[in-house]
């Protein structure tokens, strides 16, 4: 067994099916730089990094936890509509979402200007941090 936080290289075809489907649906045109499996006390987690520095993290069941892009917006199809509406409205003109994280309780996005906005599960803004 691995100690908490122990990583080992893996390949995309060894990820859970849901993770593989997510990657092929949203990032099939990108080139994978590497993939790692991390053994934690709560189970395995996975991270895939592409050559353009896009990073995607998955839970053990293959559901995505985090998508981050260095120079491009995250796929609009993974951003819940209330968050898209909040960001694309008159609040933040010219900004795009370059990172999105989710867990059981909150969603958090980082805009291209570095601003971080946290939402609860009902998509109410609960924190804005620059």
Annotate each PLM feature.
Residues 1-130:
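Long, terminal "pre-/pro-" and other extracytoplasmic accessory regions
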């Amino acid at each position: 067994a691995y100690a908490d936080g122990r990583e080992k290289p893996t390949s995309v075809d060894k990820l859970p099916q849901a993770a593989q489907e997510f990657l092929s649906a949203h990032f099939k045109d990108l080139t994978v730089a590497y993939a790692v499996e991390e053994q934690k006390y709560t189970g395995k987690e996975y991270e895939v990094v592409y050559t353009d520095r896009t990073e995607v993290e998955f839970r053990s069941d293959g559901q995505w936890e985090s998508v981050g892009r260095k120079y491009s917006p995250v796929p609009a199809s993974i951003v819940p509509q209330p968050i898209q509406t909040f960001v694309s409205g008159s609040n933040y003109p010219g900004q795009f979402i370059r990172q999105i994280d989710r867990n059981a309780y909150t969603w958090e996005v980082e805009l291209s200007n570095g601003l971080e906005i946290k939402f609860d599960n009902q998509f109410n803004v609960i924190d804005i941090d620059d």
